[in-house]
């Protein structure tokens, strides 16, 4: 991964109608903006995007891309599995309850591997806010949605964006 990959990804997402925001490079995974609420309502301008990421011929060295979920990004929603076991459990439960068709449609979504888990993205007309769907016995969230007004770090983010330093990887699907 290199900053040019990040610039290309930020630009491609922006051209696809996604509200893109820069990510802090301190392991917090938070937006690198004083305030980012306005980007829950409007997409950044091309000038703002270039100000955050630079140009292909003159990259600013950013290592992270964030997407704002919801209507501002054309109805984008994310199903966030915080670890690989959570995804396996989800798949097993769906099959156990006879939801193989639904599981197939969900798994056909755009998929990214995160440093610890998996993100599935799709667009739909009606999106609720962020929702916790499953937690372990200690109360740690294992599966949640990132919906209206939510925010997600996406591929090809790498380096200090995540506390582990592990990159986010697109499966290209």
Name each model-derived stretch.
Residues 70-87, 123-173:
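DNA replication initiation modules
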Residues 1-116, 124-126:
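Signature for HUH/AEP ssDNA processing cores
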Residues 120:
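Catalytic phosphate/metal-binding cores of nucleic-acid and nucleotide-processing enzymes, i.e., regions
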